[in-house]
A protein has these predicted regions:
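Short amphipathic alpha-helix with an adjacent loop that forms part of the alpha/beta core around
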Residues: 135-146
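Phosphate-coordination loops involved in phosphoryl transfer and adenosine-cofactor binding
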Residues: 79-81, 149, 171
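C-terminal capping/lid region of NAD(P)-dependent oxidoreductase domains
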Residues: 83, 146, 221-228, 237-258
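Glycine-rich helix-loop-beta junction characteristic of Rossmann-like nucleotide cofactor-binding loops
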Residues: 73-78, 144-145, 166
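Glycine-rich phosphate-binding loop and adjacent beta-alpha segment
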Residues: 103, 111-114, 120, 155-225, ...
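Glycine-rich phosphate/adenylate-binding loop and adjacent beta-alpha elements
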Residues: 1-45
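Mid-domain Rossmann-like dinucleotide-binding core that forms the NAD(H)/NADP(H) cofactor-binding site
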Residues: 52-134
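Periplasmic-binding protein-like
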Residues: 149-155
């Protein structure tokens, strides 16, 4: 949620608002957002079309807005570009693949096992590699005939960041929104100035971007990947699954009567 009145908000950059709040993280006296009901301003919600289920809307909204802002708002992808989507079966990665294809890009996705690699292809990726293999970045080079990629969609962090930077074409763009394997990474700075590399940060997005995601979901162009639907009583199970990497896509929780 943003303040909606500062210069950043009124210019359409509410994601940069200095007073923005993340529901369940900075709002209220307790940490966490697991609750049956939430009370927030109307301006901070978007209407769900009749043909989009509550489960699908829950699964696609935050990750979809984040992915749209990364690829369209920040990296400004164009038809014909080659886009590398790291972690293609993660919540944000699954939507990233579909947005890049929606924009006419050639998509290379990464995943950590055969099942997840197959799912990336099902989501629309043109190529997929296993980022748990030591030479994964060499396979990306082979796919691109040593030309590299135009855009890297990054949220893995330390374990792959340096290789991702090395895979960019001259003038290429890496846009990052997370660091699940660690925040401190060492890179060869020569890739930045000799290749004119763009390193961009990104977080969340705008209401207009969320509405774009919901619109394309209603048209069937973006299909949420739901790994599990769990009741609140199984919340701990969901956290264990995420920690162990035993999930593809999103975990959706359903409220229960007390």
């Amino acid at each position: 949620m943003s303040c909606r009145v500062c210069d950043l908000c009124t210019s359409g950059r509410e994601y940069d608002c200095n007073d923005r709040l993340i529901w369940g993280f900075q709002t209220g006296p307790l940490w966490g957002g697991f609750c049956q009901y939430g009370h927030l301003p109307e301006v901070n919600v978007a209407k769900i079309p009749d043909n989009v289920s509550f489960d699908d809307a829950a699964a696609v909204s935050m990750v979809g807005m984040t992915a749209w802002h990364m690829l369209v708002g920040r990296a400004k992808i164009r038809p014909g570009q080659t886009v590398l989507i790291m972690g293609g079966t993660s919540g944000v990665g699954m939507v990233g693949i579909q947005i890049a294809k929606l924009y006419g890009c050639d998509v290379i996705a990464t995943a950590g096992n055969k099942e997840k690699m197959d799912k990336c292809l099902e989501l629309g990726a043109d190529h997929v590699v296993n980022h748990r293999e030591a030479d994964w970045y060499k396979k990306v080079r082979e796919i691109t005939k040593k030309q590299g990629v135009d855009v890297v969609f990054e949220h893995i962090g330390k374990s792959t960041f340096a290789q991702e930077v090395s895979l960019l074409k001259n003038g290429g763009t890496l846009v990052a929104t997370g660091a699940t394997t660690g925040y401190d990474s060492t890179i060869d700075l020569r890739y930045l100035f000799f290749k004119g590399t763009n390193l961009l940060g990104s977080t969340q997005g705008t209401k207009a971007e969320l509405e774009q995601v919901i619109y394309w979901t209603s048209k069937g162009k973006i299909k949420p990947l739901i790994g599990q639907i769990l009741p609140f009583s199984d919340m701990v199970k969901g956290h264990v699954m995420m920690a162990n990497g035993d999930i593809m896509g999103k975990i959706v929780t359903t409220p229960q009567k007390l």
